[in-house]
Design a protein with these regions (language model features):
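Short loop/edge segments at beta-strand edges and connector loops
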Residues: 23, 102-103, 172
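Active-site-adjacent beta-strand anchor residues
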Residues: 52, 75, 170-173, 194
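Conserved Class I SAM-dependent methyltransferase catalytic core
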Residues: 148-192
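Mobile active-site "lid"/loop adjacent to the S-adenosyl-L-methionine
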Residues: 124-153
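Short amphipathic alpha-helical segments
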Residues: 86, 132-135, 181-184
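Conserved SAM/SAH cofactor-binding pocket of Class I
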Residues: 40-122, 128-130
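Class I SAM-dependent transferase core
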Residues: 2-44
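Conserved small/polar residues in nucleotide/adenosyl-binding loops
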Residues: 193-200
């Protein structure tokens, strides 16, 4: 059987249910943003969730560890990242609960179906435009810059996938807050103020 962890990779402890994540230091590794998002998002019993721009799959795996949802899916454009995520799912024996799909966020509603899920999460590329980009096909560039999808693409496809009264959770940079609110209004996603936590 093929080894799940390759020689250039490492195994990181997620500090939940004994789950571990396979990461490649040459690709984008998760940070505190993903952890905070997975802690803030809530998936109720019987609900299904999709994580866009899932990278190495850390968010759907953490969501499974913290919630009682029916199923968690991750969508990732880059084949090498999707492969990492699938191997982490297999390593943690989560094949029945977590699925990783390889595909384009711009077509997410076609892949998963319209009004098909209760929850969408996303830790998207934060940076706009081509400033500082040396190679638009570089894995790190795709993870950090809007070269393959835009904020508009992400919010549009999320709105299409969400059922009535579904929930959209996104972590992003404050400098784009006005644009985020405007884009959410464009696609009829209402901002819900929660204090101190959506779990209360």
């Amino acid at each position: 059987m093929e080894a799940l962890i390759h020689s250039n990779e490492r195994l990181d402890d997620l500090c939940r249910k004994g789950y571990r994540l396979i990461q490649d230091p040459k690709l984008f590794c998760f940070g505190i943003d993903a952890v905070l998002l997975s802690d803030y998002a809530k998936v109720k019993r019987g609900e299904r969730a999709v994580d866009l721009c899932t990278g190495n799959g850390v968010i759907p795996i953490l969501l499974e560890a913290k919630n009682n949802g029916e199923h968690y899916s991750g969508l990732e454009l880059q084949p090498q990242c999707a492969d990492l995520a699938r191997r982490s799912v297999k390593y943690n024996h989560l094949e029945d609960k977590v699925t990783i799909e390889e595909g384009d966020v711009c077509n997410a509603s076609e892949l998963f179906g319209r009004e098909s899920v209760e929850v969408v999460t996303v830790n998207p590329p934060y940076m706009i435009g081509q400033h500082g980009i040396k190679n638009a096909d570089d894995a790190m560039t795709i993870a950090r810059h809007e070269v393959r999808c835009t904020l508009d693409d992400i919010v549009r496809e999320s709105a299409k996938m969400l059922k009535f009264n579904g929930r959209f959770y996104m972590v992003h940079r404050p400098f784009r807050l006005a644009e985020i609110f405007s884009t959410m209004m464009k696609y009829h996603i209402c901002l819900l103020y929660t204090s101190p936590s959506p779990r209360d």
